[in-house]
Amino acid sequence: MVEFKILEKRPDSIKFIVSGVDVPFANALRRTILSEVPTFAVDEVEFLENDSALFDEIIAHRLAMIPLTTPHERFSLDALELDDYTVTLSLEAEGPGMVYSGDLKSSDGDVKPANPNIPIVKLAEGQRLTFNAYARLGRGKDHAKWQPGFVYYKYLTKIHVSKDVPDWEELKELAERRGLPVEESDEEIVITTIKAFYLPRKFEEHMGKGIREEIVPGSFVFTVETNGELPVEEIVSIALKILMRKSDRFINELHKLAD
């Protein structure tokens, strides 16, 4: 049975344990988050005027990498086919001054820069910049500009430290300062590594003797961070729905071949 346990939730990140799965599933979830969850990003730019020090191509690349809020409630982001809806982000600016992402005017109030303080280009006195940028839904497998964030995972492990190890109290204090769960018995302490934990060099000689690391079978600690396009919990939810839909499609194709 697959189980999820949330360890930490912040506005831009979430950490959770998923249990009852194997490495292929864990990696499939990671890859789906990075490459399959759709977001809005600038895909084409029409320049009407550019007197700045940067070429059109450089500014277009900068615009493409600006995270745009993606209204997940309005689109079926877990669908295998994407909506071809296009949003226009326009700009008309004159120097002197810095042009920021917040200066972009969107044709859709729900699709706009997630951070208004991203620099685009600095204009000198008399320099002008005018363009229309067109944002569309896309997936990270086609270009990194459509990746919704970053995700990584690790095995959930337990570090058993015998009380025969000199200075074992130091390890206990270090783990507690890191916010790691520590269980203590008469013979040992057990540190659950819900986040990365590195033993000080002085304890390395005790590995395999008084200190041993145990991998908890079928359990992984995931950390997911959002760029701002989508709420971080929606990224995980959409990725799981996409995985299920792809699995259903694969099973249906197998049944067709069997028939």
UniProtKB/Swiss-Prot annotation:
It holds the Pfam family RNA_pol_L. Keywords: Cytoplasm, DNA-directed RNA polymerase, Nucleotidyltransferase, Transcription, Transferase. One of its GO terms (molecular function) is protein dimerization activity. Its main location: cytoplasm. SMART domains: RPOLD. One of its GO terms (cellular component) is cytoplasm. Its EC number is 2.7.7.6. It is an enzyme of class 2 (transferase). GO terms for biological process: DNA-templated transcription. InterPro entries: DNA-dir_RNA_pol_30-40kDasu_CS, DNA-dir_RNA_pol_insert, DNA-dir_RNA_pol_RpoA/D/Rpb3, RBP11-like, RNAP_Rpo3/Rpb3/RPAC1, RNApol_insert_sf, Rpo3/RPB3_RNA_Pol_subunit. It catalyses: RNA(n) + a ribonucleoside 5'-triphosphate = RNA(n+1) + diphosphate. Belongs to the archaeal Rpo3/eukaryotic RPB3 RNA polymerase subunit family. NCBIfam families: PRK00783.1. DNA-dependent RNA polymerase (RNAP) catalyzes the transcription of DNA into RNA using the four ribonucleoside triphosphates as substrates. HAMAP family: RNApol_arch_Rpo3 (MF_00320). Part of the RNA polymerase complex. This is DNA-directed RNA polymerase subunit Rpo3.
